[in-house]
Amino acid sequence: MALVCGAPLASRSCLNKSLISSTHELKPLRRTILPTLRWKSATPSINMCLTTSNSVDAVQRRIANHHSNLWDDDFIQSLSTPYEAPSYRERAERLIGEVKEMFESMGPNNDLLQRLSMVESVERLGIDRHFKNEIKSALDYVYSHWNEKGIGCGRDSVVSDLNSTALALRTLRLHGYPVSSDVLEHFKDQKGRFACSSIKTEGEIRSLLNLFRASLVAFPNEKVMEEAEIFSTTYLKEAVQKIPVSSLSRQIEYNMEYGWHTNLPRLEARNYMGDMIHVMPYMNAEKLLELAKLEFNIFHSLQERELKHLSRWWKDSGFSQLTFVRHRHVEYYTLASCIDIDPKHSAFRLGFAKMCHLITVLDDIYDTFGTMDELKLFTAAIKRWDPSATEWLPEYMKGVYMVVYETVNEMAGEAKKSQGRDTINYARQAWEAYIDSYMKEAEWISSGCLPTFEEYYENGKVSFGYQISVLQPILTLDVPLPHHILQEIIFPSRFNGLASGILRLKGDTRCYQADRARGEEASCISCYMNDNPGATEEDALNHIHAMVNELMKEFNWELLKPDNNVPVSSKKHAFDITRAVHHGYKYRDGYSVANNEIKNLVITTVLEPVPL
């Protein structure tokens, strides 16, 4: 029950004899790829049969028969791109200089809105890392004109307007400026409703779109933000049905689809490129667009190199021979490269993908393939943290243990380059807590025990694996994290607890039916219903969705609170990992079965460049 959802516990499981003949001999999976296809499709099912074991007695196992790796290693190694040529980088550098000049050429009538629009555009296009100083200067300027009624379009504006105020509220809050949502009260009518016309002009629709986007960065107990979200959601749903298909309608649909907590920056950049000329008609948007496309494709060339490295790691580690586990390393890398597009952060992206894949492998071992005796041995081996601990492990576990051991130590080496100290003890503590939480779930299933909601939820926040996926990758970033600051990010900090809780709850709402069909009863839904006799499944889901909504607001506060002494970049990366994983659970469990949304994400953000 980790970062991904698996089948039920091993002690009641079985393995297909044709796939693995014994724990000593793993037959390699024969993988092929059709030249006209980028992925293979498969339908998961459950196989039940006996397989031979080390002992005289046969071991009964259950295997979830997950579909094979969709992204063949031969295909990955064959990828090529022309965008590594120096001429593309040289052209991008010239455009960066020209775009910096655009930040300065603004008139007094709409200079506030123009500055906000520039900041928003470079961020949504994924090129903001080149303009950190310009963004800060622009937002300092806007904030200097902010008052209790918001702002107008320009410094000479005598009245505030909703479009500029909503955009400023969201942008300033995301950058840590102390702005109050109370300004929105000034845009209500005498009946306490947000004022709007019945005509729904394009300008008004854009204002309500910015109001909707602002409402998503709400803090706890901000009633006006709740009202803004409800009102703008209803308004935009009606508007998108009436206006013709256009850049505006596409932006409404995208923002209502992904919001903020499931939005991925690189996916948004790809989407926004097609519409930003229409969004910024009063600026030289062509330069921004050309720069964004160049940067997208230059980073695409780096993605290919990193993906080849990851695919070789997956193949050389022997994971391709473990036919009972899910192979989602390409999907995990895609998520990593959708939230961090800084070329210097290769260790972060690859580390996140590797950690997530290890979590998936262990999830399939603990939830599906391993027996209780095997799981106890593996848990003890993790706590010893010594290659000699593999002596008593079954053959298939020996290889997995060594990959975990070597990868975690390798990541600690990368972290030492950034942190200037050995951080392996943090990683070991995280892995021990993670494995212990797995064993607790294994014992619940083995004994037929259904824990209380609170007990399941607290354990599930650890077993989800968020701590493992975050800890070592953020330590590789070029931001020193001394012990007292790191404690505010890692478990059991408030920040980490909120992130883990959100993902555990969201994951369970997407996985519980499939898990229950495979015999695994414990979930937030079943535990809530057991604690509250008479509660229906719908009652449980409503309760959990309400919990998630409140936790999201608290999470916003932990990330954005103005007195935050933790480096923003570190918390932002941890927050973005939450967004990435949450994205996979938007409609269903996108990790057990790689659905079309996940496949398309890989293609549009990693495999395909944009036309220049």
Swiss-Prot record:
Keyword Transferase: no
Protein name (record): 1,8-cineole synthase, chloroplastic
InterPro entries, per the entry: Isoprenoid_synthase_dom_sf, Terpene_cyclase-like_1_C, Terpene_cyclase_plant_C1, Terpene_synth_N, Terpene_synth_N_sf, Terpene_synthase-like, Terpene_synthase_metal-bd, Terpenoid_cyclase/PrenylTrfase
Motif interval(s): DDXXD motif: 363-367
Known catalytic reactions: (2E)-geranyl diphosphate + H2O = 1,8-cineole + diphosphate
Protein family per UniProt: Belongs to the terpene synthase family. Tpsd subfamily.
Function: Terpene synthase (TPS) involved in the biosynthesis of monoterpene natural products included in conifer oleoresin secretions and volatile emissions; these compounds contribute to biotic and abiotic stress defense against herbivores and pathogens. Catalyzes the conversion of (2E)-geranyl diphosphate (GPP) to 1,8-cineole.
Enzyme class, first EC level, given as a word: lyase
Biological pathway: Terpene metabolism; oleoresin biosynthesis
A GO term, aspect molecular function: lyase activity
Keywords: Chloroplast, Lyase, Magnesium, Metal-binding, Plastid, Transit peptide
